[in-house]
Amino acid sequence: MAAAKKAVLGPLVGAVDQGTSSTRFLVFNSKTAELLSHHQVEIKQEFPREGWVEQDPKEILQSVYECIEKTCEKLGQLNIDISNIKAIGVSNQRETTVVWDKVTGEPLYNAVVWLDLRTQSTVENLSKRIPGNNNFVKSKTGLPLSTYFSAVKLRWLLDNVKKVQEAVEENRALFGTIDSWLIWSLTGGIHGGVHCTDVTNASRTMLFNIHSLEWDKELCEFFGIPMEILPNVRSSSEIYGLMKISHSLKAGALEGVPISGCLGDQSAALVGQMCFQDGQAKNTYGTGCFLLCNTGHKCVFSEHGLLTTVAYKLGRDKPVYYALEGSVAIAGAVIRWLRDNLGIIKSSEEIEKLAKEVGTSYGCYFVPAFSGLYAPYWEPSARGIICGLTQFTNKCHIAFAALEAVCFQTREILDAMNRDCGIPLSHLQVDGGMTSNKILMQLQADILYIPVVKPSMPETTALGAAMAAGAAEGVGVWSLEPEDLSAVTMERFEPQINAEESEIRYSTWKKAVMKSIGWVTTQSPESGDPSIFCSLPLGFFIVSSMVMLIGARYISGIP
């Protein structure tokens, strides 16, 4: 029997999409942008202490190998020749910090995830050293001093992890965000691996000057970071190195394929949504929620709590584009919390069913400030609250309130962006895993009171990385010229409530947010003395209650 004929599809491009919750490898047809096959692996998060969030860098790397291998197997089953994969792009969770040993290839500590809060006291101490009239950190980086970004995570590792300290002293340490760790490992690791990052990921470290597009000596001195451990900064679209066979990757079919695209996940989604024009914006619903608006070649500094960041630089000789960004820490993560911590759902998909049963939160509001509040508040003292509960409230109302919370947070950052840009968005382009939830998308349209537009192919983050890789000089299989970009079919959600009702719900949400702020300081019980009496009002209440109880027993004659 003759072997099945391989399908001829033209050049293919692969994309590693390494997120906070999962890793995926996807393969696209570079001529049509069609997704041909993919594989996904969920990634564990570790919570060793209150407010700490870590991941195992080796597990992340192994998940990439597994996804590549399984996707190649699936392509084989479809009779698609994997030798047609001409390039690979990488998109990644940003800010998450890894330090590893370049001699052994071993991570020196777990990856400290972007959501992690352990550096709050470091941030407070550093903020005292910034002159009030000269915030050089924000003017150079576009970022507020926050636990969110890599510099303070790296500072914590240098201060607290002996292995990291020793490796730095012995010139064995390399630092990187997840993209750097993956590219170094995939291009050979200890056998000539390429230590690099791209401008979008570098711009999230708080060590990178977004004007000069270089590591900044003054910033490195301020945070006490040795510059020799930093990766080389490259554009988002160029050949960084070639795939090398690993003992962890059974099939060596992708050996020699160039890794030629790299963008932080939110920049990748901006490219994948084809927001190449000044003023175009997208909102990605993943573990967190991230609204980016392309501001062209101009750095626009927000007066309303948004970040200024590098959007992309698609080639060594191509211009840099900037973006305004509103970041929400907890979006999809609240669904995972309802599943793993409260146990009111068994799978993420169940939340849509629960919310649909009631169609309202019945006055229940959920502020999921598990890692403080990001834009537009930048308030690390906030913690999650559920308020407006009655005896009637059940798990369906809480599920609905959780979805509403994602939409309310998006409304806050959209309002801030409209004020900064001066021109309100007429519609919102969306992407990310949560957009498959139709209840969420309709709620978002109702709360914003503008249409929400969702592409039929939701994998825009991976698509953006693939586009950057395929368009790189020396690869040239993907044209980014407007006339060559494939048209994308869209699903549209129109507002279905009146504007007055939308405003009432939003203003009540804002009241709930105010109640979530001020719960924690670095001197609070969660980081210090666990004694109940470190809360003076509570201690006084307990003591006075005991005195009253003893007095009552005495007066009534009870022995």
Swiss-Prot record:
It is an enzyme of class 2 (transferase). This is Glycerol kinase. Sn-glycerol 3-phosphate binds at residues 20, 94-95, 148, 265. ADP binds at residues 20, 24, 287, 332, 433, 437. GO terms for biological process: glucose homeostasis; glycerol catabolic process; glycerol metabolic process; glycerol-3-phosphate biosynthetic process; regulation of fatty acid metabolic process; triglyceride biosynthetic process. The chain crosses the membrane at residues 532-552. Glycerol binds at residues 94-95, 148, 265-266. Keywords: ATP-binding, Cytoplasm, Glycerol metabolism, Kinase, Membrane, Metal-binding, Mitochondrion, Mitochondrion outer membrane, Nucleotide-binding, Nucleus, Transferase, Transmembrane, Transmembrane helix, Zinc. One of its GO terms (cellular component) is nucleus. The keyword Transmembrane helix applies. It comes from Mus musculus (Mouse). It is a single-pass membrane protein. PANTHER family: GLYCEROL KINASE, SUGAR KINASE. Beta-D-fructose 1,6-bisphosphate binds at residue 252. It comes from the Eukaryota. One of its GO terms (molecular function) is metal ion binding. Its EC number is 2.7.1.30. Kinase that plays a key role in glycerol metabolism, catalyzing its phosphorylation to produce sn-glycerol 3-phosphate. Sn-glycerol 3-phosphate is a crucial intermediate in various metabolic pathways, such as the synthesis of glycerolipids and triglycerides, glycogenesis, glycolysis and gluconeogenesis. InterPro entries: ATPase_NBD (IPR043129), Carb_kinase_FGGY (IPR000577), Carb_kinase_FGGY_CS (IPR018483), FGGY_C (IPR018485), FGGY_N (IPR018484), GK1-3_metazoan-type (IPR042018), Glycerol_kin (IPR005999). It catalyses: glycerol + ATP = sn-glycerol 3-phosphate + ADP + H(+). Belongs to the FGGY kinase family.
